[in-house]
Swiss-Prot record:
It comes from Influenza C virus (strain C/Johannesburg/1/1966). Residues 1-14 form the signal peptide. Residues 15-630 are extracellular. The keyword Secreted does not apply. Residues 365-650, 366-651 are annotated as: Fusion domain-2. It is an enzyme of class 3 (hydrolase). It is found in: Virion membrane; Host cell membrane. Residues 151-310, 158-310 are annotated as: N-acetyl-9-O-acetylneuraminic acid binding. It is a single-pass type I membrane protein. This is Hemagglutinin-esterase-fusion glycoprotein. It catalyses: N-acetyl-9-O-acetylneuraminate + H2O = N-acetylneuraminate + acetate + H(+); N-acetyl-4-O-acetylneuraminate + H2O = N-acetylneuraminate + acetate + H(+).
């Protein structure tokens, strides 16, 4: 900050000179108006810059996430790191086995990898699924498993988003009173799935050729090892016959396979005694598996004679903590057929963020392992972000982004705003102007007047309901003042502004409330409306904060000048007489150039360091995990002022 000392003519005695502090402002300065004080500045900058989200996945906290993967996250692979799509650091966070997938472990088809997936984390990242795809050619009474896979993955993502821990339960307790044996199927590699298990009755020729109704029991545990189970994902499987004649080759009754809870309520299965057959002309039944979310307890299975499909496994969830879920597209490279069940499942599950490739999978180690695009999309897992969303992740602190971030999103996510709408604050060389509050006269020697804001640290908290409160602290009693009337006027203005902003938000919500239950698009529209309203409210409140900042900085600079004037008066003693605020008369014959340098230029030394760059911090805080609209909004603005902001003094003399 540069000021000059200017000699003013008009004194009767030539040996006496008048020296005054005088601010220097020219056309290169811009004027910034504030509450109670204004500033001239050589530069200006926006309170925040727009941030651009980075594509791909990231996490909010490195210590609270877990991944579930396969060979593409396998650090033990001999071809690692060329075979992986993640770094070594990220691979350590995954539970995996090459060739595995959650669905393979759920059903256990013969000849496939069977891995005990389990782990805990607030945020769960799933990069698996490709090992059960059309390329795997899994039959077992069903050639196309894509729709079952979609339903399975959707339920996994839904339950994972509500749980801290999850685990495969690979051996359910069961009771089968009838004499049955584990069955096999020729179209299932002369074996069968591990879940459900196929049991068949041995019917002797002399007995009823249809056999007896099957009745069996299985128990879903409340705990599996160290993992608590509040809810289980169970596959309820049954055969679908095209007609009664196809099943009734022995003249038996209709087909049924039904699961009951401990109260006798039907929870899953198929009963052709009350439900029609498909009516198609096929001769071979098809197996269908529905996904059930069941509480721990004892369940019974009843089926028509001859065949029994028995649940043997489940996935267990503790349902203790809600958190983000990220699903990564899992597809093969060239030459292998993939499905897009993971993509569809995630997109249809609230709270699930999908990471998708834009190009075909091209591996480095082979055609199917080590894709560069996927590595880039997953590189963010090495870092912590402030915000994660369907649009990408952000680690900058700015509360604004150019485009609306698509939900789901978690953390402290920026709001969409136009760059020109973000308020600007003064920067560079700052010079205060006179204040407006003339009712406060202490200290009397004030050079530039008194402002409506006091000196020191200004703390502004803005919460969901608007301005939450102010903490205004003065550096010292002589550091300026604020009248009760001016303070009340400032608070009244801010309060009115906030009420207007709140009213706009409420109107937007009311317009869409009556449509939400009938229109999914209305939900998305409401989310966008609320985001836009929050952005407008925040921009409006930042404008208020900007005005407070300008006024506070202005009064701080004015106090610095007053302190400088006081210091000059003290150093001068009897050699200079203060005739008006910031002006002195000195006898040139008594106090020569070296004397004046001591008084006014402090022997060419800087008595106080130059003011540092404006220290402003505005922290946008919202509910750590929200989908759609935020549950809260807070802004903290803290301003630190230097005690003195004079970097040099020039003395101009005229006789």
């Amino acid at each position: 900050m540069f000021f000059s000392l200017l000699l003013v003519l008009g004194l009767t005695e030539a040996e006496k000179i008048k020296i005054c502090l005088q601010k220097q402002v020219n056309s290169s300065f811009s004027l910034h108006n504030g509450f109670g004080g204004n500033l001239y500045a050589t530069e200006e900058k926006r309170m925040f810059e727009l941030v651009k989200p980075k594509a791909g996945a990231s996490v909010l906290n490195q210590s609270t996430w877990i991944g579930f993967g396969d060979s593409r996250t396998d650090k033990s692979n001999s071809a690692f790191p060329r075979s992986a799509d993640v770094s070594a650091k990220t691979a350590d966070k995954f539970r995996f086995l090459s060739g595995g997938s959650l669905m393979l472990s759920m059903f256990g088809p013969p000849g496939k990898v069977d891995y005990l997936y389990q782990g805990c984390g607030k945020h769960k990242v799933f990069y698996e699924g490709v090992n059960w795809s059309p390329h795997a050619a899994i039959n077992c009474y069903r050639k196309n498993w894509t729709d079952i896979k979609l339903n399975f993955q959707k339920n996994i993502y839904e339950l994972a988003s509500q749980s801290h821990c999850m685990s495969l339960v690979n051996a359910l307790d069961k009771t089968i009173p009838l004499q049955v044996t584990a069955g096999t199927a020729g179209n299932c590699n002369n074996s069968f799935l591990k879940n459900p298990a196929l049991y068949t009755q041995e019917v002797k020729p002399s007995e009823n050729k249809c056999g007896k109704e099957n009745l069996a029991f299985f128990t879903l545990p409340t705990q599996f090892g160290t993992y608590e189970c509040k809810l289980h994902l169970v596959a309820s499987c049954y055969f679908i016959y095209d007609s009664k004649e196809v099943y009734n080759k022995r003249g038996c009754d209709n087909y049924f396979q039904v699961i009951y809870d401990s109260f006798g309520k039907v929870v899953g299965g198929l009963d052709n005694r009350v439900s029609p057959y498909t009516g198609n002309s096929g001769d071979t039944p098809t197996m269908q598996c529905d996904m059930l979310q069941l509480k721990p307890g004892r369940y019974s299975v009843r089926s028509s004679p001859r065949f029994l499909l028995m649940p043997e496994r489940s996935y267990c969830f503790d349902m203790k903590e809600k958190g983000p879920v990220t699903a990564v597209q899992s597809i093969w490279g060239k030459g292998r057929e993939s499905d897009y069940a993971v993509d569809q499942a995630c997109l249809s599950t609230p709270g699930c963020m999908l990471i998708q490739k834009q190009k075909p999978y091209i591996g480095e180690a082979d055609d199917h392992h080590g894709d560069q695009e996927m590595r880039e999309l997953l590189s963010g897992l090495d870092y912590e972000a402030r915000c994660i969303s369907q649009s990408g992740w952000v680690n900058e602190t700015s509360p604004f982004t150019e485009k609306y971030l698509l939900p789901p999103k978690f953390g402290r996510c920026p709001l969409a705003a136009k760059e020109e709408s973000i308020p600007k604050i003064p920067d560079g060389l700052l010079i205060p102007t006179s204040g407006t509050d003339t009712t406060v006269t202490k200290p009397k020697s004030r050079i530039f007047g008194i402002d409506d804001l006091i000196i020191g640290v200004l703390f502004v908290a803005i919460v969901e309901t608007g301005i939450g409160g102010y903490l205004l602290g003065s550096r010292k009693e002589s550091g300026g003042g604020v009248t009760k009337e001016s303070a009340e006027k400032g608070f009244e203005k801010i309060g009115n502004d906030i009420q207007i902003l709140k009213s706009s938000i409420n109107i937007a919500i009311e317009k869409l409330n009556d449509r939400i239950s009938h229109d999914e698009q209305a939900i998305r529209d409401l989310t966008l409306e609320i985001e836009n309203a929050r952005s407008e409210a925040l921009l409006g409140e930042l404008g208020i904060i900007r005005a407070l900042l300008v006024g506070n900085i202005s009064i701080g600079l004015q106090e610095s000048l007053w302190e400088l004037a006081s210091e000059i008066t003290n150093r001068a003693g009897d050699l200079a007489v203060e005739v008006s605020p910031g002006c002195w008369i000195i006898d040139n014959n008594i106090c020569d150039q070296s004397c004046q340098n001591f008084i006014f230029k402090f022997n060419e030394t800087a008595p106080v360091p130059t003011i540092p760059p404006l220290d402003t911090k505005i922290d946008l805080q919202s509910d750590p995990f929200y989908w759609g609209s935020s549950l809260g909004l807070a802004i903290t603005a803290t301003i630190s002022l230097a005690a003195l902001v004079i970097s040099g003094i020039a003395i101009c003399r005229t006789k």
